Amino acid sequence: MIRRLLFVPLLVPFLIIIAAVVLPGMGAEASEIRQVAVFQKPNFVVSEETERPKQMDAKPKKVKLETTMGDIVIELDEKAAPVTVKNFLTYVEESFFDGTIFHRVIPNFMIQGGGFTPDMVQKRTHPPIINEANNGLKNNRGTIAMARTPQPDSATSQFFINHKDNPNLNYVDARNPGYAVFGKVVEGMETVDKIAAVKTTQKGPHANVPVEPVVIKSAKVVSGK
């Protein structure tokens, strides 16, 4: 049974640290993809009007994640998720993801990365963005979506790739805001499958951590520049 949470409608105005763990008793099919969030600026307002890019590129951008287990090429959907794509590309352009790991791996669910170094140190991020889960895109196998805390508008850098269709992660309504899909794997799904199959363990408060770190060696825009 999937536990439903009540979400606070406003951003928390101070530092928050929430462990990236599966909710107790929910197992591999957990509906909550949680991330740790550490913000340098305690006061900010996330504005959909001011944050949305004014223009979209005609040609979809693709980003290649070069990992220690193979490459993954992701095509970004800027039309459906302009804020999320802009945010993701900002981290790519800053080389933020280089040297980070897939820190949470659950086969037949998803692989999550974009926030931790191999020694499980969480990286500082930019302020969070609005949740664009109500954009018509679904959390199907091979899609990439933003991880977040229980607060809907809390995604920063962490993302996950769906290892199977996860309809329980899709937008339903304000009480079930879902997880924002912003692209899909177009090359390297076999790499995703390999990562999903690695042996995992518990490291401190973090569950489902690969025993041998799966490192994102680099993340680069490879087309649509």
Where are these regions (language model features)?
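Cyclophilin-like peptidyl-prolyl cis-trans isomerases
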Residues: 2-225
